[in-house]
Amino acid sequence: GSTPCGESCVWIPCISGIVGCSCSNKVCYMD
């Protein structure tokens, strides 16, 4: 994924994961 979801995932998972975002390099990205 290359589109940032405006969310970090250093301490907690991506809340935006419900819309398809995933953690990459401590930042949530949409595939």
Swiss-Prot record:
List the PROSITE patterns: CYCLOTIDE, CYCLOTIDE_BRACELET
Q: Where expressed (tissues)?
A: Detected in seeds (at protein level).
Indicate the transmembrane segments per the record.
none
What does the entry's PTM section describe? This is a cyclic peptide.
As for what it does, the entry says: Probably participates in a plant defense mechanism.
Q: Can you quote the domain comment?
A: The presence of a 'disulfide through disulfide knot' structurally defines this protein as a knottin.
What protein name is recorded for this chain?
Cyclotide hyen-I
Q: Which organism is it from?
A: Pigea enneasperma (Spade flower)
